[in-house]
C-alpha cells in the first residue's frame, strides 16, 4: 500500500514537472518568422476576425497563448494584460490572446477578465497553437502559457514561456 502511494506521488510530481517545463521544449526562437494567421476573435463581447498581418501594419503585436479561459492562472494573466493596455498602446503594440476555447466562451472572457481592453482569438482547430509551437508537451491540443513579441516585419523579437502568469506582461513590454 505504501509503495503504491509513493508511485502515485512520484507520477503526479513527474506529470506536473513535465507540464511546467513543456514550454521550454517547444517554442519558436527569436528571429524566426512569425506564422501569419486569421482567427475568430472577441473584443468586449463583440466578435470579429483578427488578422495578424493587418495588426502588424500598426506596430508590434504581442501574441500570447494561454491554456483555458476562466481558469485561475489564465484569468490572472488576462487581468494583468488588461491593466497594462495603456502601456502597450503607448508603444503602438497590439495584444492578442490565443487559446483553444470556443468563441462563445471568449466573448464572455473578453468582457470579464480582459475587461474589454484587448482581443482574444479562438483556435478551435489548434492550427495557430501548432504553427507557434505553443502546445503543451503532454497535451499538445492545449496551449501552453507562452508569449511572443512579433515585429511589424513578422519576426519573433522576444519569447517568454512559463506556466506562471505573473511575468508575461512585464517581460513583453
PLM features per residue range, with description:
Residues 11-21:
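Bacterial N-terminal signal peptides
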Residues 142-173:
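Thiol-/selenol-based redox modules, centered on thioredoxin-like
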Residues 96, 110-144:
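Short, internal strand/loop/helix patches
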Residues 22-26:
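Boundary at the C-terminal end of the N-terminal hydrophobic targeting segment
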Residues 75-114, 126-128:
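Structural microenvironment flanking redox-active thiols in thiol-disulfide oxidoreductases
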Residues 52-75, 79:
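Short active-site neighborhood of thiol/selenol oxidoreductases, capturing the structured segment around
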Residues 38-60:
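A short beta-strand-turn-helix
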Residues 1-5:
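N-terminal secretory signal peptides that target proteins for export/translocation
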Amino acid at each position: 500500500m505504501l509503495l503504491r502511494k509513493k508511485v502515485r506521488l512520484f507520477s503526479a510530481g513527474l506529470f506536473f514537472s513535465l507540464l511546467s517545463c513543456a514550454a521550454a521544449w517547444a517554442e519558436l526562437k527569436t528571429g524566426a518568422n512569425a506564422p501569419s494567421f486569421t482567427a475568430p476573435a472577441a473584443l468586449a463581447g463583440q466578435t470579429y476576425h483578427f488578422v495578424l498581418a493587418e495588426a502588424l501594419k500598426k506596430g508590434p503585436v504581442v501574441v500570447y497563448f494561454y491554456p483555458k479561459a476562466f481558469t485561475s492562472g489564465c484569468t490572472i494573466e488576462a487581468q494583468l494584460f488588461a491593466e497594462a493596455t495603456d502601456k502597450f498602446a503607448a508603444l503602438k503594440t497590439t495584444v492578442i490572446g490565443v487559446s483553444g476555447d470556443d468563441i462563445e466562451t471568449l466573448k464572455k472572457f473578453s468582457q470579464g477578465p480582459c475587461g474589454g481592453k484587448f482581443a482574444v482569438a479562438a483556435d478551435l482547430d489548434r492550427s495557430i497553437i501548432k504553427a507557434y509551437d505553443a502546445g503543451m508537451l503532454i497535451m499538445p491540443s492545449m496551449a501552453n502559457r507562452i508569449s511572443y513579441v512579433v515585429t511589424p516585419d513578422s519576426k519573433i523579437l522576444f519569447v517568454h514561456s512559463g506556466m506562471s502568469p505573473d511575468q508575461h506582461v512585464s517581460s513583453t513590454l
